[in-house]
């Protein structure tokens, strides 16, 4: 027995020692983590890669190779799995050498510096340093070998003479990584660094794998993705005037895209603007909303707002003018620009907007209906096997029980609307209080104060705002192109299929008051009456239908509101194709045609672009080069002067749009473009006025679900409701006991009265 007692005592002692050691290790780890994120640390672009100043390895660059994945290390012991798209892994063979250092520090990187020419090895003074409010940033200079202003455009000979230099800073973190506790929460400002080597693109935010991979330009995705890139003509001090700033927000329906798909070297260097491109959270990670305090949503648009704040506070160090920031981008990027233009937290920072094929007033730009957002979140959670009994359980399952790859790669077809994810109107949502989380305050959560249309009508934007917008003639061709069913049928649409697609549209948008009337109205508007059975015209009309509904009509609506309030507004319609692509006739001018022209692709080395966009120099035509020069000059002029053509560009000029006479530049080529008025007014009015007011408003319906979610969220709430329940039970028990006691007392009194009234009976019982 004594030996057994000694063994038990020894075991207890060992357990105590183990617990003590564990506590010491945890304390030390916490202390190291706290030190590692101090403002005096050296920061290396990825979550967990911090080296404190006082350790021996401070000067050693610790790098996780983003280009080829990475393995666990002592700084980040968790293996996160491959981040490349599976279909592109064959591009990375085991014999491929790993770069010992990131970006250009490990050797010449053609995707960052262009083609390596004989004189590239003698390139001196490559590195450039800039001091920001967050610490010092190291970038690099890139040599450019073609000149958009040159009269002679060499299209079939090698270009070997350096014509310009541009200063490039890639992968600058504008917020703390939105990982772990930061998932489904607003972004937090970065805490700074001592020296940041901004020499490689940051990873893209998680998105479906069909959009990722080396051939598509998105080599790596990671939840730690809140980075921005800066291109500037010069960082030298003493400039008489700062450059205008062009803030690029990528499109992609709020579900895919990346900042590195817009290399802005030519635009910045030759047109004297500072260009900034950003990543922001996408899909469910960026826009999941339960309509309450568990996940209000809008994290992606809040990321954009924080990036804009970072630029506003720091861009002067890169010779950018913070009071001349122009937001631009295609599709979702254009819609985001319009929302930031009127949002309370950002409107004072936005001086101009260029909306390419997108509008803040589009149906897909903002989810107005709270229950639509909740329904999308429930359907998404169910698809990943999460409980939807309450919003708290739903969010906890997605936050703690699913990886970012699972969340990013899960695609969803919405019950209502075009795209599943978008900013949601949140001004009446309940949000977490200041005491709920250490790093977040109530002011961090709300983005909207009212509907965007109401903000525009109330003139809640900068007084010096200028607006420019454009659409293409075949905006929705990409929807047809990406439809797998239509692809199997060689994109042929006959009258029966047209009717089917129109009915799908009617049902998807739940025109429940008169669905048959809506169907007939749409069919009448978009039937090609000279030859109703012609499948070519039917396909063209269907593309026009979707283009007008999703892009043209919303663009027309916001333009009219701004023109009525005397905001300088310039419009264009793009009606010419990129000749080098040789696209089929029905999709010559699709959505975001301007991308390759705005990036100066006809003048850039092909190495800057992913395989998807690589076009040899001899494929570009003179018209492509002219259009590229025109768009870069017009956009940069607008950012600088508020007018895209203060003087003619290749013989072309814009006119201001006016009330009752919406003038727009109809861009065919630089030889036969012209100013016209009132683009597709009948079709725009059909979608904006006729359907909503005459046939019936949008009345969305959803699968039956519990209307209200409830679940304890915080310890104080759990304690409160537990005590409340206990008190209620005690109260009920007390009432029951009182009633029983009173009943018993009543019976006792009645018995005494009976005995008092019958003394003979009482005496008999006694005897």
Regions found by a protein language model. Give the residues of each.
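N-terminal secretory signal peptides that target proteins for export/translocation
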Residues: 1-13
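Non-catalytic accessory segments of hydrolases
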Residues: 35-299, 322, 609-631, 639-649, ...
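Substrate-gating cap/lid region and adjacent catalytic-acid/histidine neighborhood
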Residues: 365, 404-622, 719-735
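Transmembrane-helix exit/juxtamembrane "anchor" motif
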Residues: 643-645, 733-749
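Serine-hydrolase-like catalytic core of hydrolytic proteins
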Residues: 65, 215-391, 456-480, 567, ...
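Cytosolic C-terminal tails of single-pass type I membrane
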Residues: 747-767
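Cleavable N-terminal signal peptides of Sec/SRP-targeted secreted and luminal proteins
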Residues: 13-33, 171
């Amino acid at each position: 027995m004594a030996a057994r007692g000694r063994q038990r005592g020894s075991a207890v002692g060992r357990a105590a020692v183990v617990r003590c050691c564990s506590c010491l290790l945890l304390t030390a780890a916490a202390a190291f983590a706290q030190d590692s994120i101090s403002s005096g640390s050296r920061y290396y672009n990825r979550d967990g890669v911090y080296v404190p100043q006082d350790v021996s390895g401070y000067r050693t660059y610790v790098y996780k190779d983003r280009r080829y994945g990475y393995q666990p290390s002592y700084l980040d012991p968790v293996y996160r799995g491959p981040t490349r798209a599976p279909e592109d892994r064959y591009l990375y063979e085991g014999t491929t050498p790993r770069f010992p250092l990131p970006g250009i520090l490990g050797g010449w990187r053609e995707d960052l510096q262009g083609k390596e020419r004989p004189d590239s090895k003698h390139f001196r003074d490559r590195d450039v340093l800039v001091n920001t409010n967050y610490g010092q940033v190291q970038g690099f200079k890139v040599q450019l070998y073609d000149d958009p202003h040159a009269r002679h455009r060499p299209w079939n000979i090698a270009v070997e003479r350096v014509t310009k230099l541009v200063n490039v800073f890639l992968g600058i973190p504008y917020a703390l990584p939105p990982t772990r506790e930061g998932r489904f929460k607003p972004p937090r400002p970065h805490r700074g660094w001592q020296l940041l080597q901004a020499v490689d693109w940051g990873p893209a935010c998680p998105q479906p794998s069909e959009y990722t991979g080396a051939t598509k330009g998105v080599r790596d995705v990671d939840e730690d993705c809140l980075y921005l890139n800066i291109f500037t003509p010069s960082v030298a001090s003493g400039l008489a005037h700062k450059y205008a700033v062009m803030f690029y927000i990528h499109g992609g329906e709020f579900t895919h895209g990346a900042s590195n798909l817009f290399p802005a070297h030519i635009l910045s260097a030759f047109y004297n603007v500072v260009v900034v491109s950003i990543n922001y959270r996408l899909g469910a990670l960026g826009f999941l909303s339960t309509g309450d305090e568990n996940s209000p949503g809008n994290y992606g648009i809040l990321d954009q707002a924080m990036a804009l704040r970072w630029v506003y506070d720091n861009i002067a160090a890169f010779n950018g003018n913070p009071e001349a920031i122009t937001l631009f981008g295609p599709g979702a990027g254009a819609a985001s620009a319009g929302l930031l233009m009127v949002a309370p937290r950002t409107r004072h920072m936005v001086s101009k907007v260029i909306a390419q094929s997108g509008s803040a007033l589009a149906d897909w730009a903002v989810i107005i209906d709270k229950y639509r957002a909740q329904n999308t979140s429930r359907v998404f959670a169910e698809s990943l096997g999460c409980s939807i009994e309450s919003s708290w359980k739903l969010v906890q399952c997605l936050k703690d029980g699913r990886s970012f790859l699972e969340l990013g790669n899960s695609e969803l077809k919405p019950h209502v609307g075009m795209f599943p994810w978008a900013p949601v109107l949140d001004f009446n949502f309940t949000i977490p209080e200041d005491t709920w989380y250490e790093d977040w305050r109530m002011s961090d959560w709300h983005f909207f104060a009212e509907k965007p249309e109401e903000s525009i009508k109330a003139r809640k934007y900068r007084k010096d705002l200028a607006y420019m917008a454009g659409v293409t003639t075949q905006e929705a061709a990409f929807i047809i192109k990406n439809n797998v069913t239509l692809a199997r049928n060689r994109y042929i649409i006959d009258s029966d299929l047209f009717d089917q697609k129109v009915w799908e549209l009617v049902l998807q948008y739940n025109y429940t008051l008169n669905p048959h009337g809506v169907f007939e109205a749409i069919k009448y508007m978009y039937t090609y009456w000279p030859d109703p059975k012609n499948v070519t015209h039917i396909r063209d009309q269907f593309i026009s239908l979707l283009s007008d509904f999703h892009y043209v009509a919303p663009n027309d609506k916001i333009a009219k509101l701004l023109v009525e309030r005397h905001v300088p507004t310039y419009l264009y319609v793009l009606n010419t194709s990129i000749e080098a692509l040789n696209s089929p006739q029905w999709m010559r001018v699709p959505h975001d045609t301007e991308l390759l022209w705005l990036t100066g692709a006809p003048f850039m080395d092909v190495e800057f672009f992913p395989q998807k966009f690589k076009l040899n120099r001899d494929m570009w035509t003179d018209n492509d080069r002219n259009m590229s020069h025109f768009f870069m000059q017009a956009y940069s002029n607008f950012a600088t002067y508020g007018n895209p053509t203060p003087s003619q560009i290749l013989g072309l000029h814009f006119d201001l749009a006016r009330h009752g006479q919406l003038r727009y530049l109809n861009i065919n080529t630089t030889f036969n473009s012209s100013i016209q008025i009132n683009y597709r007014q009948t079709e725009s009015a059909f979608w904006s006025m006729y359907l909503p007011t005459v046939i019936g408003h949008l009345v969305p319906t959803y699968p039956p679900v519990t209307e209200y979610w409830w679940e304890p969220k915080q310890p104080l709430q759990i304690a409160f409701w537990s005590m409340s329940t206990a008190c209620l039970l005690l109260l009920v028990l007390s009432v029951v006991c009182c009633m029983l006691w009173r009943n018993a007392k009543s019976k006792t009194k009645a018995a005494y009265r009976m005995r008092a009234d019958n003394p003979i009976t009482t005496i008999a019982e006694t005897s």
